[in-house]
Amino acid sequence: MKKEPIIVNVYLWGTCIGKLNWDFEKHCSVFQFTDEYRKQDYDICPSTHPKRTPLFASFYGNKDKLYQGLPEFLADALPDRWGSSLFDQWLTDNNIKVTESLPLLKLSYIGKRAMGALEFEPEFNDDDIQETVDMSSLATLASKIYNDRDAAAISPEDSLTMKKLVYLGTSAGGMRPKAVIAYNTETGEFRSGQVDLPENFKQYIIKFKEADDSPTTEIEMIYSEIYPLKL
């Protein structure tokens, strides 16, 4: 049976630097730099995939489980444990069949929300995400998914909250439940922190408290106060 080709375009600072697809015979991705990227002054991966070497005009991804068949510098944009839990729930809710090219679908879902500078197209978009975010509902659902994982059942009334949680949480790295949000200090309004924002909004990573007795969020708060990040 012939597999449908999936192509993901990879962008950096507005420039399409390469195209990524899946080789079902090699069971990994294949990536090719664009001529537009080769004209740029920078080299994003000079040690392993230097653009000056013709041999690396196209190359296969790393089959190691850590990289899921992607080139190492692209695999870094994949969701970690928490984001993967949300993504798996999203696949189930949308009746999407899992295939070996799933890493490409993950990158498309991440789109412009990766923690680094890379962006991926085509991108999944959802207008519902632009609405105000109810932090209490997010925290309750995040705790349910994190603690139940394989058995978490999403009710119809939670479906929109689930969509927002997947959107806000898949790109944030790490194993603990979290979301990237924006907070208006004047009105107290919460929104997605991964879209263009009006004035008076500041972006934060919100870490939700887990159901067990481990004070992980409190410990991280203490460390952040001891060693504040200076921007």
Residue ranges of predicted features:
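Phosphate/dinucleotide-binding and metal-coordinating scaffold of catalytic cores
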Residues: 1-231
